[in-house]
Design a protein with these regions (language model features):
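Long, ordered, helix-rich scaffold segments
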Residues: 2-4, 8-175
Length: 175
């Protein structure tokens, strides 16, 4: 099966070149899943996200677009997503959840490496700035789990052991 973009339309072709696969209904959710996969792979970008959002400008479409934008595979896109998520209060709970999940979707893990230290440096600020639910989404979804190793585990234990963190049991439990 091959997925490609033709203009603003997604085409699914089987090995014979047929564009329609029997039994496969490509609805809005599947289009977003496929498009986000293309975004992560660097095969689609902002213009395709905008075109799909124009086609599916629903609450679910808004969430999917936020996740797809945060998944764009460039340092500039990751920085923009980080700032929007961590430093602003612009997004709703649902959009924060979708975008923060999209942030970690990468093929090149090097895109996430700059955010390990920044995660721990900003965690307490995030906790104080945002509502509980948004802070919970950010703390869980932005945690650099894809970069898991002994150094990250040690850094996490060290952060949890800080006196100011010990005073916030809910934050410690999330971590």
């Amino acid at each position: 099966i091959r997925l490609s973009l033709v203009g603003s339309e997604m085409c699914i072709r089987d090995s014979s070149g047929a564009e329609k696969l029997n039994g496969l209904e490509v609805d809005a959710d599947l289009r977003w899943d496929l498009l986000t996969g293309l975004v992560v792979a660097g095969r689609a970008g902002e213009s395709e996200i905008d075109a799909e959002l124009e086609r599916d400008n629903t609450a679910n479409g808004q969430k999917a677009a936020a996740g797809a934008r945060a998944a764009l595979p460039s340092a500039a896109a990751k920085e923009a997503a980080w700032k929007l998520l961590v430093e602003s209060k612009e997004l709703s709970n649902a959009l924060v959840n979708s975008a923060s999940l999209g942030f970690g979707r990468v093929h090149d893990l090097k895109l996430l490496e700059p955010y390990v230290d920044r995660y721990f440096e900003s965690a307490l600020h995030v906790w104080k700035l945002h509502t509980f639910k948004i802070a919970e989404y950010l703390m869980i979804n932005l945690y650099p789990v894809y970069l898991a190793n002994e150094a990250l585990a040690a850094k996490t234990r060290e952060w949890i052991a800080k006196p100011q963190i010990k005073e916030i049991p809910a934050l410690r439990r999330i971590m």
